[in-house]
């Protein structure tokens, strides 16, 4: 019993279908019926043996009483006829039992073969379910791997953000260097141009990094979309599990309803037993009344037994032997009663087993409900974690957007600075021509450049070390989020301070440059009067050309960004198309799997139809068996009637013996006791007949219950089959709708890809036109520069007068660059030379002002 419970619980845990459980219960019922038939056959054989013994005793008795009278001969003939009939009935019963046993064996073998085939099919379904489970586990592992990759990508993005912060600090340092070098801009044209070129290149690199960051951002968004799809698939799997659980709950409700029906049937049987006991009590009272009447008749006929009492003593001895035989039959019947009691106890034990199974099923249902609650809690936690990750992702996206805005602001400020530098260059171009002798500053600036390069290299090494430290501290990322936010706030404040400081420095530079321009204009106004109009016109043209060139560069950059965005969108569309194709393949595989499931369900329906037909055939066989049992019961009733006739004949003989012999009252009393014993035996025979009737009724009730259960099983199978077919049809419709949607999305993606390709081609043509315009403007710029060179040569020819003063200025500047601690001596020599040469006084004052400005800038840089 415990093993059977363990098997049942194991099958429920593994998710066996209710059809297998019903088939197993049906097999058990058939085995129980087979055991009952075997027991009935054993009892029938036992009864046949007892009847043969009784027939032998009766034959011996007939042989002994052969010479009594013609009545005895007639009785012997009747008994011989009855014996032959009984033998024929026994042979027929044996043949019927053998045929029934053979048919039952054949049916049992066919049922076992069908059940084995169904068990094999169920094992195949189990293997498929395990394969599906392994595939789901692999998919879950892949999703976890993708999640780890997304987290790593997130960590790398944050490390890149820190790298951008470090780059911003470097940009701050570079802007500080630019601020320090802006004081020397009037004397370092070539150096400033080279540094501007380097800054533009660094800016382009930063823009390329921003593009790479945008690509990584798009990749992260695609990974997030994949994760969302995986979560949707997990939700669908959970819905499937919930549907399976609901089906299991329905099966449990059906089993509970059947158990209640069986309990009601047991109550009905108890009511019938009570009614039968009441009928037996009424029959007992009626028989007792008849017995009292017969005893009164016996007392009336007792007087007539005095004559034949001597003749009937031998018959009384024979009756004693028969009474002994009847006592033996009584013992056997008591054994049968004990067997029936044992069967009743077995039925009670089976009822207890059924209640235990129901309790186990309830416990399993509670465990499944608990598991479902745990799964729902886990799903809620996963959803909350997913929402937190999405919030973090949105926050990071906002931070990246802020950084891109800040970088764009810095780019705009850099462009403004470049424009201002161009304006200062155009304003100071004439002065820079005259200050070409300041090449000695070049070596110092190169040394400073080397120092800056070494400092930049050191900063890059420090950046690498910081990146290594960040990789080492990736595991503590969750604890450092608050610190990162504080750092970002500090960076924002630093950027604001930097912007304010740059604006202040730019204003100071503009003021100093304006002052220097005023000074140089006051100094050079005498030399520029002739060519001022032409130079102003050329400067206006040059500014217009520079602005057009800058606008074209901006448009080129915007077009390049647009092209990159279109390429990224095209790549996204390609990825979406690939994802749609993969989803299409997955849906095709699901459709094939569902078609196979539909075929399996059809095969299961066919098997259930076969089982129904077999059950109907078994029902017909059981009906035939019941008819045979009714025939045997009828034969037993006929035998009972014959025995009652014999008892009546014997009572007549006893009456005659009482009339013949009145003196033997004590023997008559003994015969009366024997008659009472025979009456008790008759009562026992009647009870046996009533038991047989109750057994027949019970078999009829069981047959009705079996038919009802078969009808319920057929209705349940048809209902479940229709429900599964409808469910699968709905699933097929949903998959077809999803397939149509995916096809529509793929078509839209192809149309968008074609549209983007057309836009890309149009932008390419526009960029080519812009390049042609740029080349034309470049030609115009070259022509204007040639004109400017011609004007410059004319200015140089006019400025040959001031070469002596400029040579003195060069010597003084070289002395200042070689040794700054000799500045006082250089000033004294300049004053001496100023006293010697009058027209060079203004140049010396200009040099002194430049030196003072450079010293002030160096002091500020040191501070």
From Swiss-Prot:
> What's in the keyword line of the UniProt record?
Coiled coil, Cytoplasm, Motor protein, Muscle protein, Myosin, Thick filament
Residue span of region Nonhelical region? 1-18, 837-863
Q: What does this protein do?
A: Paramyosin is a major structural component of many thick filaments isolated from invertebrate muscles.
**Coiled-coil annotated residue ranges, if any:** 19-836
The protein's name is: Paramyosin
Partners and quaternary state?
A: Homodimer.
* Annotated localization: Cytoplasm, Myofibril
Main localisation: cytoplasm
Species of the source: Taenia saginata (Beef tapeworm)
What InterPro entries does the record point to? Myosin_tail, XRCC4-like_C
Q: Name one GO cellular component term.
A: myofibril
Organism taxonomic ancestry: Eukaryota, Metazoa, Spiralia, Lophotrochozoa, Platyhelminthes
The entry assigns this protein to a family as follows: Belongs to the paramyosin family.
């Amino acid at each position: 019993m415990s093993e059977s419970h363990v098997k049942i619980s194991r099958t429920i845990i593994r998710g066996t279908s209710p059809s297998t459980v019903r088939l197993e219960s049906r097999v058990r019922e058939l085995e129980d019926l087979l055991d009952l038939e075997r027991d009935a056959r054993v009892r029938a054989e036992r009864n046949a043996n007892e009847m043969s013994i009784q027939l032998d005793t009766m034959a011996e008795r007939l042989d002994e009483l052969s010479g009594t009278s013609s009545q005895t001969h007639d009785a012997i003939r009747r008994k011989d006829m009855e014996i032959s009939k009984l033998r024929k009935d026994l042979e027929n019963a044996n043949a019927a039992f053998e045929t029934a046993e053979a048919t039952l064996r054949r049916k049992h073998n066919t049922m076992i073969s069908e059940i084995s085939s169904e068990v094999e099919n169920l094992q195949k379904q189990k293997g498929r379910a395990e394969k599906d489970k392994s595939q789901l586990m692999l998919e879950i592992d892949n999703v976890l791997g993708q999640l780890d990759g997304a987290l790593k990508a997130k960590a790398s993005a944050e490390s890149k953000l820190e790298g951008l912060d470090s780059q911003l600090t470097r940009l701050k340092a570079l802007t500080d260097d630019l601020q320090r070098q802006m004081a020397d801009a009037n004397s370092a044209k070539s150096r400033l141009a080279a540094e501007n070129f380097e800054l533009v290149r660094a800016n382009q690199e930063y823009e390329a990094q921003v593009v790479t960051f945008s690509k990584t951002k798009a990749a992260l968004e695609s990974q997030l979309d994949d994760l969302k799809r995986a979560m949707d698939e997990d939700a669908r799997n959970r819905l499937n599990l919930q549907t399976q659980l609901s089906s299991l709950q329905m099966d449990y409700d059906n089993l509970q309803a059947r158990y209640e029906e069986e309990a009601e049937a047991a109550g009905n049987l108890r009511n019938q037993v009570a009614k039968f006991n009441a009928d037996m009590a009424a029959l007992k009272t009626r028989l007792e009344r008849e017995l009292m009447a017969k005893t009164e008749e016996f007392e009336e006929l007792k007087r007539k037994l005095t004559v034949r009492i001597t003749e009937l003593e031998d018959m009384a001895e024979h009756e004693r032997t028969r009474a002994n035989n009847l006592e033996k039959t009584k013992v056997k019947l008591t054994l049968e009663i004990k067997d029936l009691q044992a069967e009743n106890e077995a039925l009670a034990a089976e009822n207890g087993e059924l209640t235990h199974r129901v309790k186990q099923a309830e416990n399993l249902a509670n465990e499944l409900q608990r598991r479902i609650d745990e799964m729902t809690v886990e799903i809620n936690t996963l959803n909350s974690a997913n929402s937190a990750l999405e919030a973090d992702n949105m926050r990071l996206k906002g931070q990246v957007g802020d950084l891109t805005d800040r970088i764009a602001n810095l780019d705009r400020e850099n462009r403004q600075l470049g424009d201002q530098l161009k304006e200062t260059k155009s304003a100071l171009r004439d002065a820079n021509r005259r200050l070409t002798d300041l090449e000695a500053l070049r070596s110092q600036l190169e040394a400073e450049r080397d120092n800056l390069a070494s400092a930049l290299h050191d900063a890059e090494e420090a950046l690498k070390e910081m990146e290594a430290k960040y990789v080492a501290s990736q595991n503590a990322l969750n604890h450092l989020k608050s610190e990162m936010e504080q750092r970002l706030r500090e960076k924002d404040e630093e950027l604001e301070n930097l912007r304010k400081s740059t604006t202040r420095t730019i204003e100071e530079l503009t003021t100093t440059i304006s002052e220097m321009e005023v000074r140089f204009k006051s100094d050079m106004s005498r030399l520029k009067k002739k060519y001022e109009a032409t130079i102003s016109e050329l400067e206006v043209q040059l500014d217009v050309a520079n602005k057009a060139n800058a606008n074209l560069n901006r448009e080129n950059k915007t077009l390049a960004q647009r092209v990159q965005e279109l390429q990224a969108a095209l790549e996204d569309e390609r990825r979406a198309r690939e994802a749609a194709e993969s989803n299409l393949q997955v849906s095709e595989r699901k459709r094939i799997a569902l078609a196979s499931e539909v075929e399996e369900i059809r095969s299961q329906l066919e098997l259930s139809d076969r089982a129904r037909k077999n059950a109907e055939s078994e029902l017909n066989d059981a009906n035939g068996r019941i008819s045979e049992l009714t025939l045997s019961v009828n034969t037993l009733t006929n035998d009972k009637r014959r025995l009652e006739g014999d008892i009546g004949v014997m009572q007549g003989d006893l009456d005659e013996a009482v009339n013949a012999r009145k003196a033997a009252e004590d023997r008559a009393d003994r015969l009366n006791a024997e008659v009472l014993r025979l009456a008790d035996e008759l009562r026992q025979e009647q009870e046996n007949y009533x038991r047989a009737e109750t057994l027949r009724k019970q078999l009829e009730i069981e047959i009705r219950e079996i038919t009802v259960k078969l009808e319920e099983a057929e209705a349940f199978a048809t209902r479940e089959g229709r429900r599964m077919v409808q469910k699968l049809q709905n699933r097929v419709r949903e998959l077809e709708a999803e397939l149509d949607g995916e096809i529509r999305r793929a078509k839209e993606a192809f149309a968008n890809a074609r549209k983007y390709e057309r836009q890309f081609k149009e932008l390419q043509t526009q960029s080519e036109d812009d390049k042609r315009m740029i080349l034309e403007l470049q030609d115009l710029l070259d022509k204007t520069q040639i004109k400017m060179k011609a004007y410059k040569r004319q200015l140089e020819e006019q400025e040959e007068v001031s070469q002596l003063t400029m040579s003195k200025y060069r010597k003084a500047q070289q002395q200042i660059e070689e040794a700054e601690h000799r500045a006082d001596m250089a000033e004294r020599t300049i004053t001496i030379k100023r006293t010697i040469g009058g027209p060079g006084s203004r140049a010396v004052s200009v040099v002194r002002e430049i030196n003072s400005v450079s010293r002030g800038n160096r002091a500020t840089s040191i501070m």
